[in-house]
Amino acid sequence: MRHYLLVFAACATLAANSYGQRRPEDELKVPDPEAVTVEASDGVPIRCSFYPGGFIETPTDKKDKPKVEKKPGKEVVPIILLHGWEGRRRDFDELASNLQKRGHAVMVPDLRGHGDSNKVTLPNGETKDIERDRMRSTDLAGMLLDVEAVKKFLFEKNNAGELNIELLCVGGADVGAIVAVNWAAYDWSRRQLPAFKQGRDVKALVLVSPEASFKGYSLTTALNHPVIQKTLSVMIIVGEDDRSAAREAKTIHSRLERLRDAPTDPKDADLVYIKPNTTLQGTQLINVPGLPLRDYIGFFIEQRLVRKSSEFPWTQRTSPL
């Protein structure tokens, strides 16, 4: 019996050590991006990269071993990034990775007609190529369906307790910025049901080299939405040395600025305008070495969403329908 007790005690000690001490291979690390496909309501498969949130990485003295801490899923900010015309989701690889390491969950789609989202499934089951060069304003408006499908994916993650959809941020570059503003206006125009909240989840926009219109697809009407005019946190970034791009971005900024009160503390600004001296635009501007634009975006999200998360608490959003 004494031998049995000694063996049991030894096993218990080993078990306690295995649970109490994390082995090197079990140490937390920021997950790799996942390849995800969502389907827009008109049958277009949208290929995406999803960067799971909830992991905050900070540098340590050991340069090759950063410290990673876990963040509660219900506090995770979800972010959708929309590339520009003739772009693709990998254009946002660096920004998405940067934001993921700050604890956020990031979803980056190839918008229809771009990257790997270049086919549509017809009612008869056949597939047809999407010819980007032949896309017109109505086709560009169809990108709203792409974003809605992406949001549905994030919505499911919300209900699984992996993120808080109430803290949604949408970013876009050039044409992607037009889509972002139009989709935000749509999200805030959803009809509300007595027992179920629909939409009204976008709380911040990041617009990189925003254009007023492209191929007849415009953000002018969406900018007139009262929530976008006065309530949403908006960051605008443009390379100032490109006069045409700077003029369009300044016009958009001015339309929003005149309807908002100036903050007493710049850190409390809900409208931020960044204009580095360069001709680069869109994702090329975000990715240029030497400009801390990714850090600026991260700080903006920290100030406008993370620090205000108590104002938008997580809720279970299961539809009664």
List the model feature ranges, each with a label.
Residues P194-D268:
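The feature captures the conserved acid-bearing segment of alpha/beta-hydrolase catalytic domains
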Residues W85-S97:
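The serine-hydrolase catalytic nucleophile loop
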Residues G161-D174:
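Alpha/beta-hydrolase fold nucleophile elbow
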Residues L99-T127:
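Conserved alpha/beta-hydrolase
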Residues V76-I79, H83-G87:
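Active-site glycine-rich loops that stabilize anionic/oxyanionic intermediates
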Residues Q21-G73:
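N-terminal cap/lid segment of alpha/beta-hydrolase-fold proteins
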Residues G125-G161:
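Alpha/beta-hydrolase active-site loop
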Residues A262-L321:
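C-terminal catalytic histidine-bearing segment of alpha/beta-hydrolase fold enzymes
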